Amino acid sequence: MTTNGSAPPDVRLGATSDDGIAASIFALVERGAARRPELAMEMRGRIELCFAEDLAPVRLVFEEGVVVVEDGAWDAPDLRISGRLPHVVALTVAPLVGGVPNPATVRGRSALAKVAGGAVRVEGDRALGRRLLRLLAIR
């Protein structure tokens, strides 16, 4: 429980593969859910992270009270984020404003440039994408 009494959702690691990084993403999601339980509890949807490197995609499903993170793809996710792993990670370390990277900071401008230049593609539910960035934010 947090100081305001909110319990985080149950974050579970699902199927993993030899070429997957679901366990690493799981750690980020678990940390984010513990830090921002209200946000994690209100999120709903299927998210897929696809990497240009020879890595398995990571899929996340946010349901009532449960988040599952595992290696694998969705046929039709609500949100798909794709790009090179370091470029996708850059989105999680950029300071945010309004759920998007803050253009007033160097890291924020760098992350936005990766999206604007097509190095990172965000397809689908943009509101879910903003919530995911807030959940995964390192700071």
Which residues does each PLM region occupy?
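Feature captures hydrophobic
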Residues: 2-139
